[in-house]
Amino acid sequence: MLNEKIAKLMNEQINKELYSAYLYLEFANKLEDDGLNGFANWYFIQAQEEKDHALILRNYLIDNSVKVALDTINKPTDSFKTVEEILRAGLAHEEFISASINNIYGEAFALKDFKTMQFLDYFVKEQVEEEKNANDMISKYRLFGSDPKGLYMLNNELASRVYTPSSMLTAK
């Protein structure tokens, strides 16, 4: 059985991951409305990955005899006017998620909950990758986004991204 505080934080993280999926689906909708199907594809896959993260956390709680407590998912803002605003909001959100994961990790460390720390290692590594990807998207957009041909090529590159389920889900 997990410590109550860890269980509460993990349940909250499930909700944050589901909100992330909801947010990225909103980004995908906006980008698709703008004719940027490649960018939309990239965020649609991000949404799928965030849902996977929620399921991985859910499975961990269940495996440790903790009741999963889902909460309301707030509607994400849809006020983004430019692609760069969306990309920047994506990076800011990933930084928020990283801080949340780090907080849970810190609590697990303080409680000497090594099992949870080991489990969270996956998420710590994942967040490094997520922040790098978000930064790379911003850099590529800045480099190519103002040129129609460059934007076309970048959009096509992003359209080729394919969803691969997390090994943490397929291993269960």
Region locations from a protein language model:
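Iron-associated oxidoreductase/ferritin-like identity signal
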Residues: 1-172
